[in-house]
């Protein structure tokens, strides 16, 4: 009947808007579509069956070792959000990865791994890093190609897996950790905040230097995504894991 056809058409249009919301800017944040019955004046909003939640980042605690990182895709150059799933098993201190094929991304993951081996005890005192093996699945959640800019998130994820302690809820991490142990200067703060909002993240870890750039960020983004500032990678991990 006519109602079924209308709802089918609106459902298709909403799927398009859901994808635009993920890929594009804040102008696509409102995805609700529906119709008003002229006879009853009743408004009906059409949902998408598979979109029980339109958030990539859930508003609940993730399993220990799982974390979301934000960075530019090394293929499309778009700012994206990625899910890094780390777990530990009994072993001898080796690391294996799945989903990591590009050389620059492998180097980024290795930077996180090297820093983790040297510094995990500063976050989890007394822990024995080399009594475990570490497994990483790097999920390209938006299908844009992997990023080499989420190495800080991977370091935090490794700490979370080893400590068997989840990160705080609805968190994304921004920051590129280099092999030297230093952090790359973070730019495009507003783009990072927008991607986090569109993905459903309520909190974002940012370096202390980003405070000066926050002043220029759209107020609506700041009302939705709470910035949490860190001084260095150790501080970032402690704040992500709520360890003080």
Region roles according to the model:
Residues 26-244:
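Peripheral, non-AAA+ core regions of ATP-driven protein-machinery
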């Amino acid at each position: 009947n006519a109602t079924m056809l209308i709802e089918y058409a609106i459902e298709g249009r909403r799927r398009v808007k859901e994808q635009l919301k993920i890929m594009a800017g804040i102008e696509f944040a409102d995805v609700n579509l529906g119709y008003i019955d002229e006879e009853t004046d009743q408004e009906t909003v059409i949902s998408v069956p598979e979109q029980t939640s339109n958030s990539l980042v859930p508003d609940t605690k993730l399993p220990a070792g799982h974390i979301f990182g934000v960075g530019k895709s090394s293929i499309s150059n778009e700012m994206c959000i990625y899910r890094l799933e780390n777990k530990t098993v009994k072993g001898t201190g080796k690391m294996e990865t799945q989903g990591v094929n590009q050389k620059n991304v492998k180097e980024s993951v290795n930077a996180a791994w090297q820093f983790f081996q040297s510094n995990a005890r500063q976050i989890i005192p007394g822990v024995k890093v080399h009594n475990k093996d570490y497994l990483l699945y790097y999920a390209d959640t938006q299908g844009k190609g992997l990023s080499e800019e989420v190495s800080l998130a991977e370091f935090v994820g490794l700490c979370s897996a080893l400590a068997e302690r989840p990160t705080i809820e609805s968190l994304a991490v921004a920051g590129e950790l280099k092999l030297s142990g230093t952090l790359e200067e973070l730019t495009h703060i507003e783009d990072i905040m927008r991607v986090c909002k569109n993905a459903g993240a309520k909190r974002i870890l940012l370096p202390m230097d980003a405070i000066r750039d926050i002043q220029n960020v759209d107020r609506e983004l700041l009302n939705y995504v709470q910035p949490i500032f860190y001084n260095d990678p150790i501080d970032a991990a402690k704040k992500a894991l709520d360890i003080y």
